[in-house]
Amino acid sequence: MRHFLTLRDCSVDEIHQLLRRATELRDMHRAGHLHQPLQGRVLGMVFEKSSTRTRVSFEAGMAQLGGHALFLSPRDTQLGRGEPVEDTARVVSRMVDAVMIRTFGHDMLERFAGHSAAPVINGLSDLCHPCQLLADLQTFTEHRGPITDRRVAWIGDGNNMCHSWIEAAGLLGFDLHIAAPPGYRPEADILALGGDRVQVFDDAYAAAEGADLVTTDVWASMGQESEQAAREEAFRGFCVTESLMECAGEQALFMHCLPAHRGEEVEAAVLEGPQSVVWDEAENRLHAQKALLEFLMLGY
């Protein structure tokens, strides 16, 4: 049984295969070509955290592939009334062909996958966000070619998105420069996944210099609202500005997994500027996940 809980659940060759297939599926969709290999298949979607892009991309993706997506929330299921995750996994996975879970604790994903008869996909956890990384890697490849031996600058919180970038650097062989204030950096065991490809910087400009891609995320994620003021103070100097993009160079792309807070982690002029590919990046969630659904349900 194959699951997709982290990028490391796929080999390097499989990641490249998924990226190629994602671009093929995007091109087919834009050309109006009907491709429905998942007729009769059902994706169960468990949302403990609300979402726009994750829900729309998985629901639309299943519909475009000929299947159906079933939305489940703790409020509407026995999960919200204390049923053990293991029991829910045993039951739901016998009725659907795959399960996507967007949750807070990564351990919930692991417990569910450990008792599931169907593939489980990490739609986001507090540890990592591998589906977003597939879309980001697809977007970079489409605009700049292979990411191997390139340089990526992560500016801001060493959060789940940063963790997945660290995994990707170790797997795919590109340099990752992380600029984050003390207290908000990835733990040593996470950094170790990137090996000598990852460096941590105190200064955002030093991290961004010569980067092929500059990327960031919100300073306070869902569930961290009470920390907003403290985080705004800690992350002063870690905003992606026009001057920081100039430091990176005209070749640098800008990405953000969204939603973005203009004027906090990124200036509006950067988000809307010529180096920004965030809207392609957002669309590619749809196509990268369609490739993943094919891979897990059909084996290709």
Swiss-Prot record:
<dbReference type="GO" id="GO:0016597">
    <property type="term" value="F:amino acid binding"/>
</dbReference>
<dbReference type="GO" id="GO:0005737">
    <property type="term" value="C:cytoplasm"/>
</dbReference>
<keyword id="KW-0055">Arginine biosynthesis</keyword>
<comment type="pathway">
    <text>Amino-acid biosynthesis; L-arginine biosynthesis; L-arginine from L-ornithine and carbamoyl phosphate: step 1/3.</text>
</comment>
<comment type="similarity">
    <text>Belongs to the aspartate/ornithine carbamoyltransferase superfamily. OTCase family.</text>
</comment>
<feature type="binding site">
    <location>
        <position position="285"/>
    </location>
    <ligand>
        <name>carbamoyl phosphate</name>
    </ligand>
</feature>
<dbReference type="InterPro" id="IPR006132">
    <property type="entry name" value="Asp/Orn_carbamoyltranf_P-bd"/>
</dbReference>
<dbReference type="Pfam" id="PF02729">
    <property type="entry name" value="OTCace_N"/>
</dbReference>
<feature type="binding site">
    <location>
        <position position="217"/>
    </location>
    <ligand>
        <name>L-ornithine</name>
    </ligand>
</feature>
<dbReference type="Pfam" id="PF00185">
    <property type="entry name" value="OTCace"/>
</dbReference>
<dbReference type="InterPro" id="IPR006131">
    <property type="entry name" value="Asp_carbamoyltransf_Asp/Orn-bd"/>
</dbReference>
<feature type="binding site">
    <location>
        <position position="78"/>
    </location>
    <ligand>
        <name>carbamoyl phosphate</name>
    </ligand>
</feature>
<dbReference type="GO" id="GO:0004585">
    <property type="term" value="F:ornithine carbamoyltransferase activity"/>
</dbReference>
<dbReference type="GO" id="GO:0019240">
    <property type="term" value="P:citrulline biosynthetic process"/>
</dbReference>
<feature type="binding site">
    <location>
        <begin position="221"/>
        <end position="222"/>
    </location>
    <ligand>
        <name>L-ornithine</name>
    </ligand>
</feature>
<dbReference type="GO" id="GO:0006526">
    <property type="term" value="P:L-arginine biosynthetic process"/>
</dbReference>
<dbReference type="GO" id="GO:0042450">
    <property type="term" value="P:arginine biosynthetic process via ornithine"/>
</dbReference>
<feature type="binding site">
    <location>
        <position position="102"/>
    </location>
    <ligand>
        <name>carbamoyl phosphate</name>
    </ligand>
</feature>
<feature type="binding site">
    <location>
        <position position="160"/>
    </location>
    <ligand>
        <name>L-ornithine</name>
    </ligand>
</feature>
<protein>
    <recommendedName>
        <fullName>Ornithine carbamoyltransferase</fullName>
        <ecNumber>2.1.3.3</ecNumber>
    </recommendedName>
</protein>
<dbReference type="InterPro" id="IPR024904">
    <property type="entry name" value="OTCase_ArgI"/>
</dbReference>
<dbReference type="InterPro" id="IPR002292">
    <property type="entry name" value="Orn/put_carbamltrans"/>
</dbReference>
<keyword id="KW-0808">Transferase</keyword>
<dbReference type="InterPro" id="IPR036901">
    <property type="entry name" value="Asp/Orn_carbamoylTrfase_sf"/>
</dbReference>
<feature type="binding site">
    <location>
        <begin position="129"/>
        <end position="132"/>
    </location>
    <ligand>
        <name>carbamoyl phosphate</name>
    </ligand>
</feature>
<feature type="binding site">
    <location>
        <begin position="51"/>
        <end position="54"/>
    </location>
    <ligand>
        <name>carbamoyl phosphate</name>
    </ligand>
</feature>
<feature type="binding site">
    <location>
        <begin position="257"/>
        <end position="258"/>
    </location>
    <ligand>
        <name>carbamoyl phosphate</name>
    </ligand>
</feature>
<keyword id="KW-0963">Cytoplasm</keyword>
<keyword id="KW-0028">Amino-acid biosynthesis</keyword>
<dbReference type="InterPro" id="IPR006130">
    <property type="entry name" value="Asp/Orn_carbamoylTrfase"/>
</dbReference>
<comment type="function">
    <text>Reversibly catalyzes the transfer of the carbamoyl group from carbamoyl phosphate (CP) to the N(epsilon) atom of ornithine (ORN) to produce L-citrulline.</text>
</comment>
